[in-house]
Design a protein with these regions (language model features):
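Conserved N-terminal substructure of TIR/SEFIR domains
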Residues: 1-58, 88, 96, 127
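Switch/connector loops and helix/strand junctions flanking conserved nucleotide-binding motifs
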Residues: 18, 73, 99-103
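Structural motif corresponding to alpha-helix initiation and N-cap regions
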Residues: 46-49, 77, 117
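Inter-motif core of Ras-like GTPase G domains
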Residues: 62-64
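Conserved TIR/SEFIR loop-to-helix hotspot centered on a Trp-containing motif
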Residues: 68-86
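Glycine-rich, charge-decorated loop segments at or immediately adjacent to ligand/cofactor-binding or catalytic sites
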Residues: 98-112
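C-terminal helix of von Willebrand factor
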Residues: 113-127
Length: 127
């Protein structure tokens, strides 16, 4: 049986459906990858950044779903920057075919991959 990785999924709240699809793919017996979703599913109290940092640090990697909503998603932007600051491996994937014209600082200049099973598998294989 393949190792299950602890993966934090970072997404704009408007893109919660994409997170659900990604997690569903990870549970599909036909996909070549499997992971335990560690994303924030409900808003935390005022100490959410502390709780979130702890959760991110406890993960093997982070998958960031990038869409036009990302640029204004302050929580997602913070999560991505946190993962980079903590040295957590990050895979950025496009959430759809509509490529964002504007990207927030943590994403600018970084490779954003197509959402494919091969790309996700390759990322998990490196963890």
């Amino acid at each position: 049986m393949a190792k299950k990785f602890r993966v934090f999924t970072s997404f704009a709240i408007e893109d919660a459906n994409l997170r659900t699809m990604l997690v569903g793919q990870g549970r599909n017996k036909n996909t070549p990858f499997e992971f335990v979703d560690m994303s924030v599913k409900e808003p935390w109290d005022s100490a959410w950044k502390t709780n979130c940092r702890t959760k991110i640090k406890g993960c093997d990697g982070l998958i960031g779903i990038i869409t036009n909503n990302t640029v204004k998603a302050s929580g997602q932007i913070w999560e991505l920057q946190c993962a980079y600051d903590e040295g957590i491996p990050v895979l950025l994937i496009y959430g759809n075919d509509d490529r964002p014209a504007n990207l927030p600082d943590p994403v600018k200049g970084r490779r954003i991959n197509l959402w494919t099973w091969d790309n996700i598998s390759a990322f998990l294989d490196k963890l």
